A protein has these predicted regions:
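Non-membrane alpha-helical structural segments and their capping/turn regions in soluble enzymes
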Residues: 71, 135, 139, 151-155
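Active-site lining segments that contact anionic ligands and/or coordinate catalytic metals
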Residues: 56-58, 101, 169-171
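Short, solvent-exposed loop/beta-turn-alpha elements that line the ligand-binding surface or hinge
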Residues: 18-35, 45-57, 99, 119-147, ...
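Sec-exported extracytoplasmic/periplasmic mature domains
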Residues: 2-7, 14, 18, 38-43, ...
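Solvent-exposed loop/turn segments at secondary-structure junctions
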Residues: 4-8, 17-19, 65-69, 95-96, ...
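Short strand-loop junctions, especially beta-strand C-caps/beta-turns
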Residues: 62-66, 93, 148
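Periplasmic binding protein-like
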Residues: 61, 79-128, 158
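Append "and occasionally in soluble cytosolic enzymes with long acidic Gly/Pro-rich linkers
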Residues: 1-76, 160, 211-212
Length: 213
């Protein structure tokens, strides 16, 4: 789907200076997924799908219509889950019902401070916490990180946050997508360190400082 322009994801701060690589990555492992289902009491039926208490195991992935890459990612995710025995399909609703959907494929990113894309996303009742995720330890660690300007204090808090998030995931992280831009060599001042994906401020964050030689 992304033609090699990206990397598998395992956490919220993977491309940030505060990334903690020593957490569970949840790498793609179909056999482990089957084992988890069976440990949870699911049994494989004659139709190739798992059942639990007489009900077929599955869910619907909702995805926005305006981003074909996300639609394609959702389709592949559904196909891979079907291959291990889960009845997973996708839908492309005209309007997003944050409270009524079963799962939603979403994306976000920020080249700025770690607080910018953690506190508001994973903090209880925060504005970008669309899934209603709530974890007291996550709240505590994110608050500690944003209340300090000491890099060591913040690193310790973000390390703990990432460990807890891996133990109690809010999302299934799929991938980080690279952004590719082409600009005339005469344009000076483009900052590659703040280039991000297809939405947000992105490459134009400092356009007022650009010059043409």
């Amino acid at each position: 789907v992304i033609l090699g322009q990206g990397m598998p994801a395992y956490g919220a701060l993977q491309r940030n200076i505060y990334n903690n690589e020593d957490v569970e990555h949840y790498d793609y492992d179909p056999e482990k997924a089957k084992a988890v289902l069976e440990e949870a009491g699911c049994e494989l039926g004659d139709d190739g799908f798992y059942y639990r208490d007489g009900e077929k195991v599955g869910f619907v992935i909702s995805v926005g219509a305006g981003d074909q890459v996300r639609v394609d990612i959702a389709q592949i995710a559904a196909q891979q889950l079907q291959q291990i025995g889960m009845d997973v399909t996708i839908e492309i609703p005209a309007q997003v019902d944050w409270g009524g959907q079963m799962a939603y494929l979403i994306g976000w990113g920020s080249p700025f401070d770690a607080d910018d894309h953690t506190y508001k996303v994973f903090g209880t009742d925060k504005g970008a916490n669309y899934s209603g995720y709530s974890n007291e330890l996550v709240d505590q660690y994110l608050t500690e990180a944003r209340q300090s300007d000491d890099p060591e204090v913040r690193k310790e808090a973000y390390d703990k946050f990432q460990v807890e998030l891996a133990n109690d995931p809010a999302y299934a992280f799929i991938c980080y997508i690279d952004a590719n831009y082409v600009a005339d060599a005469d344009i000076q001042g483009i900052d590659p360190d703040t280039i991000m994906g297809h939405h947000g401020v992105g490459i134009f964050w400092n356009v007022a400082d650009w010059t043409i030689q």
